[in-house]
Structures are given as C-alpha cells and as structure tokens.
Amino acid sequence: MAKYLIMLFPIFALMSFISRNATEPNPWTTKDMVSPEKLSSLIQDNDKSNDPIILNIGPSGAIKGSLKIGSVDNPKGLGLLTNRLSKIQKSKMVIVYCGCCPYDNCPNIRPAFTILNKQGFTNKKLLDLPVNLKVDWIDKGFPME
C-alpha cells in the first residue's frame, strides 16, 4: 500500500499544480505585454538611454542584450532573480521572457512577474511569446546573441 502511495504522490502533486495555475489569474495584464517587434526596435535603437533590462528567466536562447537568470521555478532561481532585481531602479523598464512553451504551461513567468509586482517595479513587461522563443522570436529574425 505504501508503495502505491509513493507512486501516486507525484501524480497528485502535478495535478494540484496544474489546477492551481489554471485557476489563478495571471500576475500581468495586457498593458504589461511587449511585442517582439517593439523589443526588437528598442534593442536596435541607438538611443541607449531607453534600453530596457531584459531578463532571460528560462532555459531558452539569449536575446541580444539579455541577462541570463535561468529557470525561476525553484528556490535557487528565484533567489538569483531577486538578487538581480535588487540592483535595478524600480522605474527602469524590465522585460522578462522565458520562451520554453505557451504561457499556460510555463513554470517561470508567473513566479518572475509576481516578484516584479511585489518588489514594486513600475515599468515591468512580459515579452509576448505565446508559442515559444523559436516560433515567436528566432524564426522571425529578431536579434539573438
């Protein structure tokens, strides 16, 4: 009996995680989204005064100028993100992206955006990658490292 409970626990934990994510509202709004086209133009703009801080919070490739944090679906990753954010002015434009998968399945964007909200960032953005980084950024020829 104990053997079966041990085998079933991960399944129940996963189901709980999925149902919780499905019922919780996203911590971002449509006004918090930035299109790939807009970010690409900001990256290629010669005016460095309006450059955003771009944080890669997933396992995907590096967009030009982004800082690699890595996955934040674990305490170590959340700690790295929190530490990096502590060095950034709250009014600075901060754009996060993961690009591993569609938003509904992504384990990284919700925790990252929640931290941005809790820390009081006023110009926080989520890069709009509804499918993944390859389809929504790389295949369209936007700048990579």
Please state what every model-predicted region is:
Residues 2-4, 16-31, 61-145:
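Rhodanese-like catalytic fold shared by cysteine-dependent sulfurtransferases
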Residues 6-63:
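Flexible, polar/low-complexity N-terminal or interdomain linker segments that lie immediately upstream
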